[in-house]
Amino acid sequence: MKDDKEKALSAALAQIERQFGKGSIMKLGDNTTMDVETISTGSLGLDIALGAGGLPMGRVVEIYGPESSGKTTLTLEVIAEAQRNGKVCAFIDAEHALDPVYAEKLGVNIDELLISQPDTGEQALEIVDMLTRSGAIDVIVVDSVAALTPKAEIEGDMGDSHMGLQARMLSQAMRKLTGNLKKSNTMLIFINQIRMKIGVMFGSPETTTGGNALKFYASVRLDIRRIGAVKNGDEIVGNETRVKVVKNKIAPPFKQAEFQILYGEGINNLGELIELGVKHEFVEKAGAWYSCNGERIGQGKANAAKYLDEHPEMAKDVDTKLRDMFLSKTVVAEDKSEVKEKEKA
């Protein structure tokens, strides 16, 4: 009886693969893509909080927060990191507000970055779908969901009511996009804004635009907030930023990271590296002096960060030690033939 069932299952699997292509159905243990490929966010603390070393490829990511909290800066850092790894990126600028000079300062190669400034929300999402189906794009950023205005709203009069139009448009787009994103291994990042619900007595009155579909389809949701100012004397030179991982399908959620975003420079990753290094004893601190591997690297955090900037191999060493300590990567399932050969050896 058991043999009959196995034969019937094998025949069904063979028919499914013939009809829908190889890999359309498989046993979960045979899946060689169990280990999710990630791209660093530019912040070591946030990579650790995400649990996988960065944002996942082939998934939908939502980054939301108040105005001037660092949403676009964070996505530009991801794009810069992706480009350094030879990946192709696109920026759908629905807000028509991307500053190429600032993007270049953050390390983005603007000569290679694809940019689109669509007229309507439908056009923006259609462009995203076409880029995804091409299989040639690795990272797409949509800035922002709130600016994805439905065509009917643009063509209508100013006082017209368009209840639920944007939510319906996004819900349909999500249904179309998620399968294609997985197949082409493309990361899609949506930047979103915060709105207030009226008449909320208990719980948070905050909500994001575009309905509930994006909340469900996103594998990672990040809540980014400005929590203070970075000062050099009396001059404000940046923001203290906190990011909460509100939803995470690839690792445990609800972790958070704090880092500095410096004006004109982006995430202060070297300062963060020193703080985490001291906390976990990869960098020694005696008074105001910082040392690494028995070598003094500077008096004060700013000088120590400058030293690491001039000695990238030392910064890389501390970064690697911290990542090895926190990020235990899932081992990719190997091809069975390779496993058998190893067992014989």
Curated annotation (Swiss-Prot):
HAMAP family: RecA. PROSITE patterns: RECA_1, RECA_2, RECA_3. GO terms for biological process: DNA recombination; DNA repair; SOS response. This is Protein RecA. Its main location: cytoplasm. Can catalyze the hydrolysis of ATP in the presence of single-stranded DNA, the ATP-dependent uptake of single-stranded DNA by duplex DNA, and the ATP-dependent hybridization of homologous single-stranded DNAs. It interacts with LexA causing its activation and leading to its autocatalytic cleavage. Belongs to the RecA family. The gene is recA. ATP binds at G65, P66, E67, S68, S69, G70, K71, T72. It is found in: Cytoplasm. InterPro entries: AAA+_ATPase, DNA_recomb/repair_RecA, DNA_recomb/repair_RecA_CS, P-loop_NTPase, RecA-like_C, RecA-like_N, RecA_ATP-bd, RecA_C_sf. One of its GO terms (cellular component) is cytosol. GO terms for molecular function: ATP binding; ATP hydrolysis activity; ATP-dependent DNA damage sensor activity; damaged DNA binding; single-stranded DNA binding.
